[in-house]
């Protein structure tokens, strides 16, 4: 028996008739399924127990042998073997066909493999196979050509002339004879000769034929096996028949399709035995062919066979295809045991690493563990007794349950799982009720809210799984977002508002200027109601024992507020005292200006000092995020998660105390709003007058009106924000970053402004009312356009974004960190990414966390800042940019030489941990999720750049899809294919512009549409591949003109442009990994003396291997050019057929793989999931498969790590 979990590759091929018979346990001769009275399977039928095995465990059909003791006996009465009924899932049967039948995949697929091999058109093949024409197999003396077609009349004519001297056949038999006669070696030789001379259409056909012939020759498949003599029947449990309540039966469609085949086959046998007339036999053979076609792929040819209610029957091919097919439904994702699902509720008192599990759910999930413990503690006598105790929910069960779940992490998952933070591990605590309690800080990562969201719980069972969950997936470990390395667990809403309120200062607060000895005094005074949170006070600096305070500062009084003293309690001791929301205070020291020498104070003391000082800004959401990032950088993850918990508690506590609410009175309408509106109304009238006089065009008028009203809204917004009290609840909410922004407030109290029509064009009639005043009917109607479009957009966007993520994951799933250093000698030159003058991504962000490829010296001091292959940390990156260096070479995934993945050095640091990336990290999947997850935040709209002349710029999600699918973009830019000077720009016919570029050896002219904006002028010198007009470049063309490196950088820049414009930050390395996957194939131009086929797509590594061999043997190498594939195409072109088949176009991929006899080396993640092995990433990598752990004598503390013994 082969070990199911330990094989190295999987191979697929065509099955010979002998092979099919060897799989089979007997021939199915009757179309019957089960007897309607006894409900037992019919003998020799589709469910026959003699062929497929018994329906009941250890019991033969007639009941003579029952029980395990007769294991392996074959009953002498009914012929059924006594064994487990499970064999009915694996035993196959077969049908001996009375006439050969063609397999529809090989005859009908595009391109038709059978047609290419025989050099016949698919049309001709169809005529022969479906008995419309004869094919000449052996022409004899007739002068006919071999493989030519004859109609019935022509065949009669020749048959009368040359009786018995030539052979022409109909149906699959004729094709089978032709296939058997093919000599692959001779075909190969003649085709290789033809390649030398042929051109155009003949050349492409020859290349296609050569590919098929080569496939058959290399794989050892016999071409005649594309014609079936024997049909396999899949095991009955996979096409079950079940009884419904009303005594009727529900059956799998396959049984109907098999039944048709058997009926027709039996009828054909009988007709042949009777020696029926040829025309009747022919008709029956054709019907048999059609029945087999329907079984294999119903609906591929002609009308599909339908069942009751005109529903097409699901054939074998449909069982594999699509979301409901075998691959995606059962192999890539399975339902698992030990899982539960419930609504989530907030758990504000939980620690970062905890979640609350409902008691009933926990009991059911941990049932086996509890049962074992009950028996071990002798609370229950045996397992059965333990089970009944649990079902009765006896009191002693709960104590045991608490011990069982202690330190046994569970996984919580929220659908849709867009990135790896959608599944995290927590330690469960038991809670009453039926809702799962979730820690408020992890909601951002899950994108969860508590309006009825549900989450699933999974229990990791094995010790290894528990260890992985605890070490890698615990929520307290996942503080950084893998897409940009920024903290993802920032406080939000109430927590932000609470901390904002806590750090506010007020001028009129009670007892301002009181000086306290230490923190405890402050807290007591606050508890006793002597001071308010917002009271500005002084505290002796020495009492803080803060290591960042200087000697001089320690002897002074620190001017701060009660709230800030409380806030600073939660921050690690060695941190500076945070007194103002500034980066300097955060990174280094508390500014000197807050330390006051008590001797210098005048008569009014500290109170008088405070009255002169401006109030300090409170801490908003962004600043809280910066604090978290800083603490994370300087301290351990544990410290950070502890501080986060404290920050959360403070936030909730003080937002409750603040009692901030919104009332209608908080929305104050601007008194002089009408004046602003009247003023702008006059401007609009003036523009209309100019238009009526013909001074400006319709476009100019429209743009001017839109601009006037936008300005009006901006002016109202500005004045509103000015007139707002700092303590206005709405202002506090928006200023702190808890909820809302200035624009929302303007709509409530100012004016709603301009709205967009369904087409996306802005309606020039503004909504001058605010929600506080109420809208008129017309205004309300206009504003519904936008609102409804928003909802429709969101729904569409979610589906689109999910599909994009799926394609990205599929193309990059086999990119894993495979080695430490690939030793490449190339690097990527990086600098600022700019669009015109606008900064898209600064240089410093591009180099941080990457490895250098060159030595960088300070231009003035000549001091070495960094050497090659060293990690550029945040400090070094700052040094490099401070030295005025604007570009450098770094290690990049683009230039990595590692096969099937990247190396540690070319990837850089792991953004999710901030540490060096480890071998085994599945960086491809992380990259795909990082790009796909923010997809839902991108817009769907196409921006219209004013008027008729403006071209549409595709942005947001459609643009990302356009880039990754390598499609021709909308609004395409014209690029120059030569280096030279722009000689002339003139008008050509059809209002087009002609740009003439003069190079050293040739002059080329390019046509651009009359409305496109030019980016060059006469006399300007241009590089090869430079853009002449505005717009997006077509990447495939650009690759041919500008080369590989320029194309990679261009695609990277374009992706970053879209995301950064929407305010989404994604690290370059993720885009690099994806773009590299799109460029991993080359197209062979000339094969030289290698075995490669001209015109074929091969992996870049296979190409270099073949050439290396050729060089060794002093032969001519092959030449090739790089090819840019869209992600869908790249996924289908992957080396692994299992991965490609489970993605899209399942039948095409499998047909191709079977003919080529492909082997899948199971290198990616998907292939291993499909066959049920551990994925070759992380601890599942082959290099870690035989690691053993020693058991420590003494308990291991958290800081030590268990020693690993090879």
From Swiss-Prot:
InterPro entries (UniProt xref): DNA-dir_RpoC_beta_prime (IPR045867), DNA-dir_RpoC_beta_prime_bact (IPR012754), RNA_pol_asu (IPR000722), RNA_pol_N (IPR006592), RNA_pol_Rpb1_1 (IPR007080), RNA_pol_Rpb1_3 (IPR007066), RNA_pol_Rpb1_3_sf (IPR042102), RNA_pol_Rpb1_4 (IPR007083)
Entry keyword set: DNA-directed RNA polymerase, Magnesium, Metal-binding, Nucleotidyltransferase, Transcription, Transferase, Zinc
Role this protein plays: DNA-dependent RNA polymerase catalyzes the transcription of DNA into RNA using the four ribonucleoside triphosphates as substrates.
Name used for this protein in its record: DNA-directed RNA polymerase subunit beta'
EC number: 2.7.7.6
Main enzyme class: transferase
Complex and partners: The RNAP catalytic core consists of 2 alpha, 1 beta, 1 beta' and 1 omega subunit. When a sigma factor is associated with the core the holoenzyme is formed, which can initiate transcription.
Gene this chain is encoded by: rpoC
GO BP field: DNA-templated transcription
Binding, Zn(2+) 2: 822, 896, 903, 906
Annotated cofactor note: Binds 1 Mg(2+) ion per subunit. Binds 2 Zn(2+) ions per subunit.
PANTHER family the UniProt entry points to: DNA-DIRECTED RNA POLYMERASE (PTHR19376), DNA-DIRECTED RNA POLYMERASE SUBUNIT BETA (PTHR19376:SF54)
Entry cofactors: Mg(2+); Zn(2+)
Recorded family membership: Belongs to the RNA polymerase beta' chain family.
Organism: Staphylococcus haemolyticus (strain JCSC1435)
GO molecular function, one term: DNA binding
GO cellular component terms given for this protein: DNA-directed RNA polymerase complex
SUPFAM superfamilies linked: beta and beta-prime subunits of DNA dependent RNA-polymerase
């Amino acid at each position: 028996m082969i070990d199911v979990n330990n094989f190295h590759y999987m191979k697929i091929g065509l099955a010979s008739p002998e092979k099919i018979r060897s799989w089979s346990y007997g021939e199915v001769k009757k179309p019957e399924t089960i007897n309607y009275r006894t409900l037992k399977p019919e003998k020799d039928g589709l469910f026959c127990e003699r062929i497929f095995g018994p329906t009941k465990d250890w019991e033969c059909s007639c009941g003579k042998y029952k029980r395990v003791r007769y294991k392996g006996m074959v009953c002498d009465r009914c012929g059924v073997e006594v064994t487990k009924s499970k064999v009915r899932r694996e035993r196959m049967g077969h049908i001996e066909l009375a006439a050969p039948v063609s397999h529809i995949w090989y005859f009908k697929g595009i391109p038709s493999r059978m047609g290419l091999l025989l050099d016949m058109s698919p049309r001709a093949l169809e005529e022969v196979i479906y008995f419309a024409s004869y094919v000449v197999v052996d022409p004899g003396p007739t002068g006919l050509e071999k493989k030519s077609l004859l109609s019935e009349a022509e065949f009669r004519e020749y048959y009368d002339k040359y009786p018995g001297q030539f052979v022409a056949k109909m149906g699959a038999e004729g094709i089978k004879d032709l296939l058997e006669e093919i000599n692959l070696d001779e075909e190969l030789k003649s085709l290789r000769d033809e390649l030398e001379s042929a051109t155009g259409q003949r050349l492409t056909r020859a290349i296609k034929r050569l590919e098929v012939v080569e496939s058959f020759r290399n794989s050892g498949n016999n071409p005649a096996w594309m014609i079936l003599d024997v049909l396999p029947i899949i095991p009955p449990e996979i096409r079950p028949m079940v009884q419904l309540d009303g005594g009727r039966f529900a059956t799998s469609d396959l049984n109907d399709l098999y039944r048709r085949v058997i009926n027709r086959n039996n009828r054909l046998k009988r007709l042949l035995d009777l020696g029926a007339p040829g025309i009747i036999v022919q008709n029956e053979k054709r019907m048999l062919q059609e029945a087999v076609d329907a079984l294999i792929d119903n609906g591929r040819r002609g009308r599909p066979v339908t069942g009751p209610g005109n529903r097409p029957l699901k054939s074998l091919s449909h069982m594999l295809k699509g979301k409901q097919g075998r691959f995606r439904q059962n192999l890539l994702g399975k339902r698992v045991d030990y899982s539960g699902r419930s609504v989530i509720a907030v758990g504000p008192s939980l620690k970062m690493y905890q979640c609350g599990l409902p008691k009933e759910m926990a009991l059911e999930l941990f049932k086996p563990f509890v049962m074992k413990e009950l028996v071990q503690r002798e609370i229950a006598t045996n397992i059965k007794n333990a089970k009944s105790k649990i079902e009765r929910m006896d009191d002693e069960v709960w104590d045991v349950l608490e011990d069982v779940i202690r330190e046994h992490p569970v996984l919580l998952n929220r659908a849709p799982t867009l990135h790896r933070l959608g599944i995290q591990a927590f330690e469960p605590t038991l809670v009453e009720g039926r809702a799962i309690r979730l820690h408020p800080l992890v909601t951002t990562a899950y994108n969860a809210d508590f309006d009825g969201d549900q989450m699933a719980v999974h229990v990791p069972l094995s010790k290894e799984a528990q260890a992985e969950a605890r070490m890698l997936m615990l929520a307290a470990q996942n503080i950084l977002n893998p897409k940009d390395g920024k903290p993802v667990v920032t406080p939000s809403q109430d927590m932000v508002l609470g901390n904002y309120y806590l750090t506010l200062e007020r001028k009129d607060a009670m007892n301002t200027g009181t000086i306290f000895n230490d923190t405890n005094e402050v807290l007591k005074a606050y508890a006793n109601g002597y001071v308010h949170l917002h009271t500005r006070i002084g505290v002796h600096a020495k009492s803080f024992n803060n290591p960042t305070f200087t000697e001089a500062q320690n002897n002074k009084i620190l001017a701060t507020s009660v709230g800030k003293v409380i806030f600073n309690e939660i921050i690690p001791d060695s941190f500076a005292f945070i007194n103002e929301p500034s980066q300097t205070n955060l990174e280094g020291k508390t500014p000197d200006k807050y330390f006051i020498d008590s001797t210098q104070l005048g008569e009014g003391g500290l109170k008088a000092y405070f009255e002169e000082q401006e109030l300090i800004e409170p801490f908003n959401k962004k600043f809280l995020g910066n604090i978290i990032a800083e603490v994370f950088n300087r301290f351990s993850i544990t410290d950070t998660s502890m501080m986060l918990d404290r920050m959360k508690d403070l936030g909730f506590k003080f937002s409750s105390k603040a009692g901030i609410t919104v009332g209608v009175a908080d929305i104050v309408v601007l008194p002089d709003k009408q004046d602003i509106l009247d003023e702008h109304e006059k401007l609009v009238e003036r523009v209309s007058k100019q238009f009526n006089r013909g001074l400006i065009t319709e476009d100019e008028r429209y743009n001017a009106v839109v601009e006037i009203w936008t300005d009006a809204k901006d002016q109202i917004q500005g004045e509103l924000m000015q007139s707002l009290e700092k303590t206005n609840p709405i202002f506090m909410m928006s200023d702190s970053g808890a909820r809302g922004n200035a624009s929302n407030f303007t709509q409530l109290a100012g004016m709603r402004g301009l709205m967009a029509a369904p087409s996306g064009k802005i309606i020039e009639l503004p909504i001058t009312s605010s929600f506080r005043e109420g809208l008129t009917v017309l205004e309300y109607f206009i504003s519904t356009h936008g609102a409804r479009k928003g909802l429709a957009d969101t729904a569409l966007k979610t589906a689109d974004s999910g599909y994009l993520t799926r394609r990205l994951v599929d193309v990059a799933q086999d990119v894993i960190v495979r080695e430490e250093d690939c030793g490449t000698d190339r690097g990527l030159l990086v600098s600022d990414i700019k669009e015109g003058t606008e900064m898209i991504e600064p240089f410093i962000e591009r180099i941080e966390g990457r490895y250098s490829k060159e030595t960088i010296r300070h231009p003035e001091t000549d001091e070495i800042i960094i050497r090659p292959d060293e990690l550029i940390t945040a400090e070094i990156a700052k040094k490099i940019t401070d030295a005025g260096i604007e570009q450098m070479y770094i290690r990049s995934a683009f230039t990595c030489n590692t096969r099937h993945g990247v190396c540690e050095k070319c990837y850089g640091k792991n953004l999710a941990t901030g540490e060096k990336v480890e071998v085994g990290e599945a960086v491809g999947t992380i990259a795909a999720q990082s790009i796909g997850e923010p997809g839902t935040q991108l817009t769907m709209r196409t921006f219209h750049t004013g008027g008729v002349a403006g071209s549409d710029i595709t942005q947001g999600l459609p643009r990302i899809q356009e880039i990754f699918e390598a499609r021709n973009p909308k609004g395409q830019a014209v690029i120059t294919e030569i280096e030279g000077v722009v000689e002339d720009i003139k008008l050509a016919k059809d209002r087009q512009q002609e740009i003439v570029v003069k190079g050293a050896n040739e002059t080329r002219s390019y046509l651009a549409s009359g409305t496109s904006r030019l980016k060059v002028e006469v006399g300007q010198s241009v590089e090869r591949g430079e853009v002449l007009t505005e717009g997006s470049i077509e990447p495939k063309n650009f690759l041919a003109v500008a080369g590989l490196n320029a194309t990679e950088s261009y695609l990277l820049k374009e992706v970053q442009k879209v995301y950064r414009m929407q305010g989404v930050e994604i690290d370059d390395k993720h885009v690099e990994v994806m773009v590299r996957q799109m460029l991993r194939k080359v197209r062979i131009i000339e094969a030289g003396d290698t075995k490669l086929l001209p015109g074929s797509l091969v992996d870049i590594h296979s190409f270099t291997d073949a050439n290396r061999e050729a060089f060794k043997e002093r032969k001519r190498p092959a030449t090739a050019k790089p090819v840019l594939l869209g992600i869908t195409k790249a996924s289908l072109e992957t080396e692994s057929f299992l991965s490609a088949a489970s993605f899209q176009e399942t039948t095409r991929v499998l047909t191709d793989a079977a003919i080529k006899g492909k082997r899948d080396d199971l290198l990616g993640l998907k292939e291993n999931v499909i066959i049920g092995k551990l994925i070759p990433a992380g601890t599942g990598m082959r290099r870690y498969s035989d690691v053993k752990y020693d058991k420590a004598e003494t308990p291991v503390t958290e800081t030590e790590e268990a020693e690993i013994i090879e």
